Amino acid sequence: MISWTKAFTKPLKGRIFMPNLFVYGTLREGENNHKYMKEATLLSRKASIAGSLVDTGNGYPGLLLENQLVAGEWYEVSEETLKRIDELEEYFGPGDTRNLFDRIECQVNESGGTHLGWTYVYNRDDYLETRFSDWKQYRLQHASGIEEKQDVPHSL
């Protein structure tokens, strides 16, 4: 397995490569945690990965690894931004049982091709059974009456 932290921050001809991140929930543009992305570079507004989304019942979605397509956005982020998002998502490190979300390597599809990077998958069994592919669309169609909390773990 490639260590993306090392692979994407290794200088090449004076340039520092930064990790890429696929976001699918409250970190997307127009959502309540998009402020965490203010220093990120948007690579694509129309990206997708394999999986499906579930409603956690807490005002944010969770990603499950399944064979559907999930809509989202594709960003280049700094190590500092990635660390702040790790904290937001309650990601403590690989295999840590306290993780609310696990950060995993993923294959992202967008108009420019297929790329590798990071995303977060939900690490709990407590969610509503309905599966969907686009958080923004789902949230608009299924106003649940649950007020979205700010600065608590909200999935991508």
UniProtKB/Swiss-Prot annotation:
Pfam families: GGACT
Swiss-Prot/TrEMBL keywords: Antibiotic biosynthesis, Lyase
SUPFAM superfamilies per the UniProt record, alphabetical: Gamma-glutamyl cyclotransferase-like
InterPro entries named in the record: AIG2-like_dom, GGACT, GGCT-like, GGCT-like_sf
Associated pathway: Antibiotic biosynthesis; butirosin biosynthesis
Primary enzyme class: lyase
A Gene Ontology BP annotation from the UniProt entry: antibiotic biosynthetic process
Catalytic residues in the record: 89
CDD domains: GGCT_like
Catalysed reactions, as listed in the record: gamma-L-glutamyl-butirosin B = butirosin B + 5-oxo-L-proline
EC numbers on record: 4.3.2.6
Function, in words: Cyclotransferase that catalyzes the last step in the biosynthesis of the aminoglycoside antibiotic butirosin B. Cleaves the amide bond via transamidation using the alpha-amine of the terminal gamma-L-glutamate of the side chain, releasing it as the cyclic 5-oxoproline.
Family from the record: Belongs to the gamma-glutamylcyclotransferase family.
Protein name: Gamma-L-glutamyl-butirosin B gamma-glutamyl cyclotransferase
The organism of origin for this protein: Niallia circulans (Bacillus circulans)
